[in-house]
């Protein structure tokens, strides 16, 4: 592992442990050149299904794209980055367990909205407003009315 401080190519692992969910491994490393310590988080590379977009295109699942969308919905809300990461981790596990080779973006969006509804209702409405592409204020108000009923 390349040192982020001096760019030396070799480092030794000082400590290694799985995270709480067991999906990543946290490693504490020490550079063999400058002796500075740094942390890495390693994840097993999994083959996730292709996402079928609304227009029929297929593209590989992009975790960072989904994280960015959820983070935008949670902007200035009391939702931690860790909560968002766990939400996306659960989604990836669900995708793996489904065994599907392709999954519609609609299914991913609905699942994220269900999760956000339980975490933060303002973030839910923000995500839904982009995901569902409300055509006018009436559709938006209808969604808010449904939220208030729950």
Swiss-Prot record:
GO BP, sorted A to Z: negative regulation of DNA-templated transcription
Cofactor(s) required, per the database record: Zn(2+)
Residues spanning the signal sequence: none
Zinc finger (unnamed): 3-34
InterPro entries membership: ATP-cone_dom, NrdR-like_N, RNR_NrdR-like
UniProt keywords, alphabetically: ATP-binding, DNA-binding, Metal-binding, Nucleotide-binding, Repressor, Transcription, Transcription regulation, Zinc, Zinc-finger
Domain ATP-cone: 49-139
Cofactor binding, per record: Binds 1 zinc ion.
Molecular-function GO terms, alphabetical: ATP binding; DNA binding; zinc ion binding
One family name in Pfam for this protein: Zn_ribbon_NrdR
Superkingdom of the organism of origin: Bacteria
Similarity comment: family membership: Belongs to the NrdR family.
PANTHER family in the cross-refs: TRANSCRIPTIONAL REPRESSOR NRDR (PTHR30455:SF2)
NCBIfam families in the cross-refs: transcriptional regulator NrdR
Reported function: Negatively regulates transcription of bacterial ribonucleotide reductase nrd genes and operons by binding to NrdR-boxes.
The protein's name in its UniProt record: Transcriptional repressor NrdR
Gene: nrdR
